[in-house]
Amino acid sequence: MKRILALLTSFIISSSILHAQEVNTTESWSGAITIGTNKLNIGFNLLSLSDGKQACTMDVPEQGANNIPTEIIKNDADSLSISITALRATYKGRKNSAESIVGQFSQNGMSFPLSLTPGKVELTRPQTPKQPYPYATEEVVFKNEAEGAVLSGTLTYPITYGFQVKETIPVVLLVTGSGGQNRDEEIFNHKPFLVIADYLAKHGIASLRYDDRGVAQSTGPTQGTTTENNLSDAEAGISYLRNLNKFGQIGVLGHSEGGTIAFMMGANKSVDFLISLAGGAADGLKILVGQNKASMQLQGIPAIVIEQYATALNILYKDRIGGKQIADHKQYVEDLCQANKLTLPENLKANLAKCITFGGEWITWFLAYDPSEAIRKIACPTMALNGTLDMQVLSKDNLPVIKENLPANDKHLIKEYDSLNHLFQHCAPATALSYGAIEETISKEVLEDIANWINSLK
């Protein structure tokens, strides 16, 4: 139960099952279970429906899961009993008073004390800026005419805007990581891009962040899109900023896939400077196999099993890059293991079978892409950052590629931060992937380094 519930990420379910009934009242209770040295917040929402019946949903905000359907087994003056079928879990509690329920949360044969008090789970995010902001923001729209995309975003002006010559004010386009994300790159109630935009504005730097296609108010085709399409949207954002004629140097800051896109934009000579936050520099195959190995090591899986799984995954992904047609996924995995003398447990074989098609065209393109060629073409000042505890884009696999291929420039800054994860949060090895459980959104040192480096380019 290193992750409550490892199954949980598969059940980020909306409350649509309740839409047929109007909710008259909601009574929320919350508490936390302790797993080793980690705390995980859990909330239950008891709903009174218009037909007189009761319903209940469960929230685990650190894992981005809200409104998970549950079944109320018993709810009377003395006790509360809930079944969470999707997670094979239960909660049984005794009501001590109107302010306290003491009970046990059980899943897969393990049980954890869980005391509840009235109120919803509230995650603490101390770095998220609160309005009113001491700087101006503007809601904007720009178009990628070539691909029929319309992107909505926020242009944030620095505090000093209007008091400086505009040619001295740099502006940065913020590009999110993989998957559809909003302009704040929001994850587990963290809003990294909002925090970055706020910090930059307070240090004389403008920024534009935008919702990805199909997210919030942004529109455009999403079926079958790859990193190249996301690059095209980012290039449209840069063109928009240039046409505004409001700023001086125009750069890009990308995180994860966005960091790789930043390298591509540098190769295209479309930006004056670039910042890659945990951007992939190694080829996609190496990145994905590496992150799988790192995740398995965190889970305490034996080294021999990890190496066998990595061998199988490497072969499978190479077949996928080559366009091999696989009709029977289960049989393909069995044949692969037999041919390579791999003795993997059934659950890992099932994972391999899913990897044959998982992620669609985006993953297939990503696996085959090697950013090093783009990096060799970069002429503009480049900042590339990674954390030693990044389990998604491993610094040991990526920073050396950047150092080896990036043409010399005394304005470059390549830096590795000790004990920072993929989101640049401080963490321990065991909590490197526990993004939601960490209150810090992004290291202050990273924010300072970004702002200082951009301002040094003026």
Go through the PLM ranges and name each one.
Residues 380, 391-405:
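Short alpha-helix in the alpha/beta-hydrolase fold that links the catalytic acid
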Residues 121-167:
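N-terminal cap/lid segment of alpha/beta-hydrolase-fold proteins
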Residues 163-166, 178-201, 208, 284, ...:
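Short substrate-entry loop that stabilizes the transition state in hydrolases
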Residues 277-377:
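Accessory cap/linker subdomain of secreted extracellular hydrolases
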Residues 224-244:
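Alpha/beta-hydrolase active-site loop
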Residues 22-95, 100-108, 127, 164, ...:
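Central antiparallel beta-sheet cores of small beta-barrel/beta-sandwich binding domains
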Residues 237-301:
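Primarily recognizes the serine-hydrolase "nucleophile elbow" in alpha/beta-hydrolase
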Residues 378, 384-386:
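Short beta-strand/loop motif that positions the catalytic acidic residue
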